[in-house]
Amino acid sequence: MRTKVKYLLIILLVTTQISCNNWMDLIPPDGLIREEYWKTKEDVESVLMAAYETFAETDHLLFVFGEIRADMVVGDNNQSRNEELISEGNIYPDNEICNWLSFYTVINYCNEVIKNAPEVMEFDRTFTEFQMQSLTAEAYYLRSLCYFYLIRIFKDVPLVLEPSETDNTDFFPTKSTDEEVLTQITNDLIQNRVFAPNGSFSNIEENKGRASKAAFEALLADIALWRFDYEKVIEHVQNIENTAQFFLLPGSVWFENYFPGNTLESIFEIQFDGDRNQRNSTYDLTRFDARRYDPSIKAIEMFSFDFARELVRGENASIRRYGEGDYIIWKYVGQAADGRTFRSGTRAYSCNWIVYRYADILLMKAEALSQLERYSEALAIINQIRTRADVLPLNLANNPVAFEDAILEERALEFAFEGKRWFDLLRMGRRNNFARKQNLIDIIIKNVPSTQKRILATRLTNPLGWYLPIYEKEIERNRNMIQNPFYNF
């Protein structure tokens, strides 16, 4: 038994001093024990920055979990075998992609900040109540965001609210239901949003890359939409609209959302900076010579000049043609919406990962309005997005299914390859007691090998198969962990 427990945050994953800009240069030094830490405001900030940095390291997983089981990307020759198996529907608990350690590492950092920050005020008289509440609010936000990803990926997961820092820690937690997790994080966000920063940092990277009040409202809107609480979605989106701080970029500069990023449309995005060796994963996932992920046939038909009139979001913006019938994802490798100017040097790995932007929350609101049968208001928002993209407005029948399909299509156009498509489809499949379950199944099996389509379609009539299994090593390690019954082969 350990007699002096090392500060677990430090010994888990922080093995390098990577930072994306000055505000993330504070990482806890290796080898500290708890009794030597949590003495100053800087100690709190450094652990919070470690949480942000570790979350940034999940960008590869956010792409994989948000895209590869859907219909907008396909694997190329160098797609990893584990990811190929998932995209083909051959999903088993021994697949390392099912390891949730990265998310729980972020959660543990956040738990440390939440638990210990108040005590630091006793040692550091310059650490004010206002500063403490602001930093802990950011920790609540990151923890809630991680849990929101976890329940959409795995459904029921352990709800760990205390840091792993003593011998009394429960290292064998049981799972909580997804609803229990959603209730917890919703309450945490509502209680702490008042303390969140509000654009008061001295640089754009912090204002867009740290959990602001608007980021709180965006996450709350997203959670409410997942729970089909449409009035709450509208309330949270309107709270953002009322700030008058965010706008849709003109179509002529739409690509600035990706280069250089941090635009007036941005609400919250993970910051990367190749100059500081804080490199994203999306460049290597999507560049042509890597041959890992390409646009699907559906994406090509949505964006290619051969099939569509998407002048703002289409060919040379979202995708780029490489010879006859060959395309790459352009958002993360291009420097302009011209299909010619590539990111180069350290800029190649500097594209941020956008978690929320204004177009996203507007379409959340449109979805909520349409489900409440407020069709004219919903249509106005859809056409606002389309007008910005220089495409013709829609006329839709006044029924929720027509609007659901139109919004799904608009979100696919606007947020292609941004890690949102799978979760959008999953939300559609769950709505109204799985009324459109077959639509989701048809989409899932579209890109799987023909020999597997019928078998997979039958298996996926069980909605538990829409979620990933718990990694087998987690089951072996934790005697209280129960596998998703869909994967009890």
Q: Which residue ranges define each predicted feature?
A:
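C-terminal motif of bacterial Sec signal peptides marking the signal peptidase cleavage site
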Residues: 18-19
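Short, surface-exposed recognition loops and adjoining beta-strand edges that mediate ligand/DNA contacts
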Residues: 35, 61-81, 160-162, 197-283, ...
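Elongated scaffold/linker segments in the mid-to-C-terminal portions of large proteins
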Residues: 39-43, 48, 52, 76-102, ...
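Conserved, well-structured interaction surfaces
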Residues: 41, 45-49, 53-54, 79-154, ...
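Structural register within alpha-helical repeat arrays
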Residues: 136, 143, 150, 213, ...
